[in-house]
From Swiss-Prot:
It comes from Mannheimia succiniciproducens (strain KCTC 0769BP / MBEL55E). Belongs to the chorismate synthase family. Reduced FMN (FMNH(2)). GO terms for cellular component: cytosol. It comes from the Bacteria. The gene is aroC. FMN binds at R125, S126, S127, N243, A244, G283, K298, P299, T300, S301, S302, R324. Transmembrane segments: none annotated. This is Chorismate synthase. It is an enzyme of class 4 (lyase). Homotetramer. Pathway: Metabolic intermediate biosynthesis; chorismate biosynthesis; chorismate from D-erythrose 4-phosphate and phosphoenolpyruvate: step 7/7.
Amino acid sequence: MAGNSIGQLFRVTTFGESHGIALGCIVDGVPPNMALSEADIQPDLDRRKPGTSRYTTPRREDDEVQILSGVFEGKTTGTSIGMIIKNGDQRSKDYGDIMDKFRPGHADYTYQQKYGIRDYRGGGRSSARETAMRVAAGAIAKKYLREQFGVEVRGFLSQIGDVKIAPQNISEIDWAQVNDNPFFCPDQSAVEKFDELIRQLKKDGDSIGAKLTVVAENVPVGLGEPVFDRLDADLAHALMGINAVKAVEIGDGFAVVEQRGTQHRDEMTPQGFLSNHAGGILGGISTGQPIIATIALKPTSSITVPGRTVNLNNEPVELITKGRHDPCVGIRAVPIAEAMTAIVLLDHLLRHRAQCGLK
């Protein structure tokens, strides 16, 4: 199975399955002499891990990361950093009913058709549980970006179902508020509506989609490698690689269809840009403005409402998904999206520094 790595100079490779012994990753390209320990990584994992609130899956996992290599006496050595997270709260028996059935809307069918075999326990490799290691690697990238370049990568949930937050001025977002509620939401009035919606969904045994935004501030000018490794292209690639993501927007995204050139162009003065419709990227290269990316996540198909599907013999069957699942996968996707953004930014920063130097 290919496709387990991302990045060139800062390269992340993950391995492991939802109900396997452990998850792991190898991170290559971390510059030497950066102070690093598990304590630097754990906070982001705690934001993503299951069972932290009544709005997410009740599966309980400590998600305690262990650094295996690449750190000596509290500092990175420049060699590969290996990390693992052991799986604990496994209830594989919940998935016995789908051993020979395909869950609608999941990767069961495509994995079986491609490989002729699949780990049906919680989706195996296709489970969002794998993203724990992306968050671990992303925490390293975020730390280096913050300490060496002052770059901050943060995200917030902007919509669940038809409930939208109030329009946000990026420079005025209260990030303390975002981290102080289980929805990663900057709008307290929307938090209350999110709460009501999720409660109803759990009663109905149903799920819902979501939209979230990632903001990277203080990004240096010049990151991106036109024409095929444009910064926005690589960000879209990384964010689309997150489970359940069905759309990515950079800057104003699809809204540009209704804009005129006089409105959309980000005019400039000696003091800087007058707007940021482009989302901090022009010609595939960072402008120095905040980089803004928004992703849409589909509603999970793991619901208790009966649905039609087929089995391995292509016979029609009815399926009720058992196990423990999120009514809205977008809630826990915020730290994942932050991690993928940070991984791409650090990779491009190292590539830019290698070719052009940093001014």
